[in-house]
C-alpha cells in the first residue's frame, strides 16, 4: 500500500486528503483497526520518531502521549512507585507492569488534562499490560512496531470497535530530504538527524560540574522530547519522565512558566490531601482529573462550591502556604530548552519548580547572566550548542 485515503485534512472542509509515498514505494505502516485521520498520522509519525530515538539513546523502552502534534508526556520504562500508580490511575488488577507499560503510564500520567484523547506511540511491542491501561483511557489511537494478539483484541474493542491501531515498520528509514508546501510554495530541508546522547552533555558551564547518571538520562529525555515539540518549547523531567512540557509559545519565559506550572501540578497531585480526596463511587477518570486540576489550582472555589457533584464530603482548602511547603520538596528536576535562555528569569522560574540540572544550546548575548543565575542556585548547566526548533 503506497497510498491511504483520509476522510479529510486538518478540518472537515479540507478535501481531498491522503498520505502517500511520492516514490511509489509502500507506506511504512499497516492499519490494523479504525480509520486514522490527518492529525492522527502527524501525531503517530512524530511520536514514533521520539520514542525510537529515546530507546536508542537510553536503552530503555519508551512511550509518548501526543496531542495536536506535540507531546503531552514522554517517558522511559522505569518502575512506578505506589504513589505514582495512584496518581496515574493504575488499576492494581492489571498486575505487574512491564517496562514498556510503565513508560506509557508515566507518559500518559504526567499531564492527564492534556493527554485526554491522545495518540500513543510505543518504541516496543504493545503488550497486554499496556492494552489494559489504555482500555480505560480516552484515546484516539496508537502506533507501535507490533502487538501481542491478546493486546490487539483488547484495543480493537475500544471506541465501539473503531479505535485507531497502526503498526509501523521499525526498519523504515525515511529519505534524507523533507518537503512540504505552504501557500503553494514548496519548502525543502534536510531531515533533523542530529543525534542526542550523553556526549552532547560534556560542556558544563557552571561552577557545579556534577551531573548524575540519572540526571543525564533526564537531560536526554528532555532534549529528544523537545526535538519533536512545536517551538518554542521547554521541558521539565524527573525520574525518567517529562513532568511538564510547554509547547508552541512565542516567548521563552512563557514556555518556562507553562511547563513549570505543569510540573508543579504533577507534584501537587502527590500530596496526601489530593491523594485522599473523597470521590464518590462512579465518578469517571476525566471528571476526577478535572476536579483535581481545579482543586490544586487558583480556581479551587469552583470545585469546592460544587463539591457534592463529585465528592462524598467537602474537602478543606489546599492553601497557598500548604502548596508552597509541599512544592519545596520537589528537588533534582531537570529542565531542557529547544533554544537558548535569553535572560536569567527563566532560571529563576525553573528553580521554583525544583530544577537542579539544565540543558540548553547557549548562545545568548546574556549567557553570562544566565550562568550567574544558575550558579546562584547551585545548578549544573550544560550548553549543547544545538538548537532544536520544530515546526
Task: For the regions a language model picked out, list residue spans one by one.
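C-terminal binding/interaction regions
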Residues: 118, 122-123, 127, 136-166, ...
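Active-site-proximal loop/turn and secondary-structure-junction residues that shape catalytic pockets
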Residues: 70, 126, 239-241, 249, ...
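Flexible, glycine/charged-enriched surface loops at secondary-structure junctions
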Residues: 57-65, 165-168, 231-238, 268-279, ...
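Gly-rich Lys/Arg/Thr-decorated short loops/hinges at beta-loop-alpha junctions or inter-strand turns
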Residues: 23-35, 110-116, 189-209, 286-307, ...
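Conserved helix-loop functional segments at active or binding sites
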Residues: 53, 228, 265-269, 352, ...
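Active-site loops and adjacent core secondary-structure elements that bind or stabilize anionic groups
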Residues: 1-200, 215-233
